[in-house]
Amino acid sequence: MVAPTPDNITGWVLAGGQAQRMGGVDKGLQLFQGQALALRAAKRLQTQVHIVKLNANRHLSDYASWGYDVHPDSLSGYAGPLAGMLTGLQNCDTEWLLCVPCDSPFFPLDLAYRLGMAVDAEQSIMAVAWAPEVNAQGDTVCRPQPVFCLLHLSLQTSLSDFLQSGGRKIDAWTAQHANARMDFNLPHDTHQAFANANTWQELKGLEG
């Protein structure tokens, strides 16, 4: 197994959801500071990886107009982000796949580097980002952000089997594997790094 570097990582933007809490719009095409969310995500990935591709299930020609390869889920029925990740592994040209959702406009510009450091240090085939959150007691604790993950291609069979058996929860699948943890809680890490927009109000709040 070759350690991840920018040359052997494919960036994968997950934009295939139904956005039910936003009235069913195609979330990746919604504007954030004048730019489509999925396009913003792709551009943030572009400097970190070898190539960027998109996962979308609607308006494919709109996504393709940006110049990136676009792939709909290989499983039917909107099976969730894991289905998008599986599609990424099935269409990955490199040894590693870096997944990000389209609706977190401030994810770190060193995401690939730091997750790569984590898998290299622990010799694992998966790394997951962790970020500070305030819990019900008012304490700040780091929690996993599993949609932000670095996956080795060898995970394709495991993920396919999990989905075929009816599994849909990301945490349940990642728990099947020893995965490296990378905390994004350094002084320069913004508290909004992994904030996502599930509603119009949240999207407006992120715009400031």
Regions from the PLM with identified roles:
Residues V2-A193, W200-E207:
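Nucleotide and nucleotide-moiety/phosphate-recognizing core
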